[in-house]
C-alpha cells in the first residue's frame, strides 16, 4: 500500500476528479458517506455529537458528515470556524446544504467562540484542518484544540488530527495538535501515523476507501509503502519436490560471548525455523556446549578465544553471514569484526554489538559486502548517524546512510522501516508490544540470515523477514497475550507464520 507525502495527496485528488470524471463536491460527498458509515458502526444515534469544522475542505468533509449523520437520526451540535469570512468552495456548498437540516444545531463562529460543555459521553468530530497543513496552529485555532484536548470527550479526527503535519513535525507546536482517540484516514495512511511520538495524537487509525482512482494511485510514484499480506506472500519462493538441503543455502552465524550464549541460540533457532539448508554457528568455547545442546540441528565452529569473538573466519563456503547477537564489545572483538568486514565477500546481516562497534568505526560501514543488511533499533542507528530529534529525522538519516553506504537497513520499531539504497522505505504492519523484550532482535537476525542464504534479494529478504517475524509475534500474542510473551514464543510460532504466508 502506497503512502504519499501530503504534497502528492492534493494531486491525487485532482487526478481522480479529472480521470473519473467526478466533481470535487461529489468526491467530498463520497468521502463523507464513508465517514458516516464508520461513525455509525461505532456509536448509536443517541450519542451526543459535536462537530468542529474549519474553513477548508476538511471542514467541508465535517459539514457533509454532519448532514449525513443527521439523516441517520443523530443529533449534532456543529461549529464552523469562519473567522476570516472565507470558506473553500466545497465547504461553502456544504454549509448551504446543512442549513435547516433537522437534528443539527449549527453555529458559525466569526468572532468570539463560546465553547459548549463536553461530557465524557460526548463524541467530538475534529474537522478543523486536514493533511494540507504546513505550519503550526496558533491563536484562536490553537485555543480550540487545547479546549478539545482538555475535555473528557472521545475525539474522532477526519483524515488527520488537526495541527498534525503529514510527515515532518520537528518544528511543530505539539500542545496545539488535537489528541484523537480515532483517526479516520481517507483512502491511504499518512507517514506521520507510523512514528511513535505521534501516537498520542493519532490514536487508533482506520482507513476508509473513498474511491480514489486505483490507476492514478498505481501510476503515481512514492518512496514510501506499507507492506500488505498478499504482497509479502508473493515474495515467497516455491520449494521443489526434489530439493535438498544444498538448495536452501549455507549460513554462518557469528555470535555469542561469555554470558551471552542465549543470543546465539535464539538467532540460530530462528534461522533454522526459516528454511535455511545448513547453519554453522561460530562461537567462543564457553558457548559451544550450550549451542550444541540447545540447537542440535546447527553445527558449531570454535573461535580461538574461550570467551569472545577474537578472530575473523573464512566465509567463502557460505551464502550469507550474520554477526552481532551477544557478541560483546571486547577490544579483540572489535579488531576481529573489522577484519571480518575486510575479508568477507558474502552478504552480511549486522546486528546488536556489531552495530555498536561499527558506531565507533563508521568508515567501515561502506566497506560491508554488497547486499548487506543492518538491523538497528533507534539507539543503535543513532550511534551510526548521530542524535535525532524524532522518528522522521531518524528515518531520513537512515535513508542517507543506506544510499551512501549501499546497504539495506531494517530500522526496528512498532512499524519497522526497511530502507533501501535507492531511498525506498517499506513499513511493516505486523507485530505487537509483547515483542518488546530482550532477544527479539536476535530472532529477526536469524530470519534475515536464513532468507539471504536461500538467495533472496536483500530488499525482499528484509521485507519478508520483518513481516514474518512480526506475524509470528502476533500468533504468539493471540495464543497467550502480550504480557507473558518471551522471544522463545516468537521462535516457536515461526512455522505457523510461514504457513500463513504460504496459504
Predicted regions and their residues:
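Intrinsically disordered, low-complexity coil segments
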Residues: 99-105, 168-176, 312-315
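Small-residue (G/A/S/T)-rich helix-start motifs and N-terminal tracts that mark the onset
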Residues: 1-82, 88, 182, 193-349, ...
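Short, glycine/acidic-enriched loop or turn micro-motifs at the edges of active sites
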Residues: 125, 129, 162, 354-356, ...
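Internal gly/pro-rich beta-alpha loop/helix module
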Residues: 121-123, 128-222
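Short gly/ser/thr-rich secondary-structure transition/capping motifs
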Residues: 104-111, 138, 163-168, 232-237, ...
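Short, solvent-exposed loop/turn segments at secondary-structure boundaries
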Residues: 89-90, 136-138, 169-170, 385-389
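Nucleotide and nucleotide-moiety/phosphate-recognizing core
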Residues: 36-128, 136-158, 344
Amino acid at each position: 500500500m502506497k503512502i504519499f507525502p501530503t504534497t502528492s495527496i492534493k494531486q491525487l485528488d485532482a487526478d481522480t476528479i479529472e480521470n473519473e470524471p467526478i466533481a470535487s463536491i461529489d468526491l467530498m460527498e463520497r468521502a463523507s458517506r464513508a465517514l458516516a458509515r464508520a461513525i455509525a458502526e461505532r456509536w448509536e444515534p443517541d450519542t451526543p455529537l459535536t462537530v468542529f469544522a474549519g474553513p477548508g475542505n476538511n471542514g467541508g468533509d465535517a459539514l457533509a458528515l454532519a448532514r449525513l449523520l443527521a439523516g441517520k437520526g443523530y443529533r449534532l451540535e456543529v461549529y464552523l470556524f469562519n473567522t476570516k469570512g472565507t470558506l473553500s468552495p466545497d465547504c461553502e456548498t456544504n454549509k448551504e446544504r446543512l442549513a435547516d437540516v433537522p437534528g443539527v444545531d449549527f453555529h458559525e463562529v466569526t468572532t468570539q467562540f463560546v465553547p459548549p460543555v463536553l461530557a465524557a459521553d460526548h463524541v467530538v468530530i475534529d474537522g478543523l484542518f486536514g493533511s494540507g497543513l504546513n505550519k503550526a496552529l496558533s491563536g484562536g485555532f490553537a485555543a480550540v484544540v487545547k479546549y478539545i484536548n482538555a475535555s473528557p470527550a472521545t475525539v474522532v479526527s477526519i483524515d488527520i488530527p488537526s495541527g498534525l503535519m503529514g510527515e515532518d513535525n520537528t518544528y511543530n507546536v505539539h500542545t496545539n495538535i488535537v489528541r484523537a482517540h480515532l483517526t479516520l484516514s481517507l483512502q491511504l495512511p499518512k507517514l506521520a501515523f507510523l512514528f511513535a511520538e505521534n501516537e498520542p495524537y493519532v490514536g487508533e487509525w482506520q482507513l476508509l476507501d473513498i474511491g480514489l482512482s486505483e490507476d492514478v494511485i498505481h501510476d503515481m510514484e512514492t518512496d514510501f509503502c506499507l507492506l500488505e499480506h498478499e504482497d509479502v506472500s508473493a515474495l515467497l519462493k516455491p520449494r521443489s519436490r526434489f530439493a535438498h538441503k544444498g538448495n536452501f543455502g549455507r549460513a554462518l552465524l557469528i555470535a555469542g560471548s561469555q554470558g551471552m550464549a542465549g543470543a546465539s541460540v535464539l538467532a540460530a533457532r530462528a534461522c533454522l525455523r526459516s528454511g535455511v539448508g545448513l547453519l554453522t554457528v561460530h562461537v567462543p568455547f564457553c558457548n559451544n556446549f550450550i549451542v550444541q545442546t540447545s540447537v542440535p540441528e546447527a553445527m558449531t565452529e570454535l573461535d580461538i578465544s574461550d570467551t569472545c569473538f577474537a578472530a575473523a573466519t573464512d566465509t567463502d563456503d557460505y551464502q550469507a553471514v550474520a554477526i552481532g547477537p551477544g557478541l560483546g564489545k571486547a577490544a579483540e572483538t572489535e579488531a576481529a569484526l573489522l577484519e571480518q568486514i575486510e575479508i568477507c565477500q558474502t552478504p552480511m546481516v549486522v546486528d546488536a554489538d556489531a552495530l555498536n562497534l561499527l558506531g565507533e568505526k563508521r568508515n567501515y560501514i561502506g566497506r560491508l559486502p554488497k547486499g548487506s543488511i543492518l538491523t538497528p533499533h533507534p539507539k543503535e542507528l543513532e550511534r551510526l548517524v548521530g542524535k535525532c530529534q524524532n522518528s522522521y529525522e531518524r528515518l531520513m538519516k537512515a535513508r542517507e546512510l543506506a544510499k551512501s553506504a549501499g546497504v539495506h537497513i531494517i530500522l526496528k520499531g512498532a512499524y519497522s522501516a526497511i530502507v533501501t539504497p535507492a531511498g525506498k522505505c517499506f513499513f511493516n504492519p505486523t507485530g505487537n508490544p509483547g515483542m518488546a523484550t530482550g532477544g527479539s532482535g536476535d530472532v529477526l537476525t536469524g530470519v534475515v540470515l536464513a532468507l539471504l542464504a536461500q538467495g533472496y534479494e536483500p530488499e525482499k529478504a528484509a521485507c519478508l523477514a520483518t513481516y514474518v517475524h512480526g506475524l509470528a509475534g502476533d500468533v504468539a500474542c493471540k495464543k497467550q497475550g502480550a504480557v507473558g510473551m518471551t522471544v522463545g514464543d516468537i521462535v516457536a510460532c515461526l512455522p505457523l507464520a510461514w504457513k500463513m504466508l504460504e496459504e
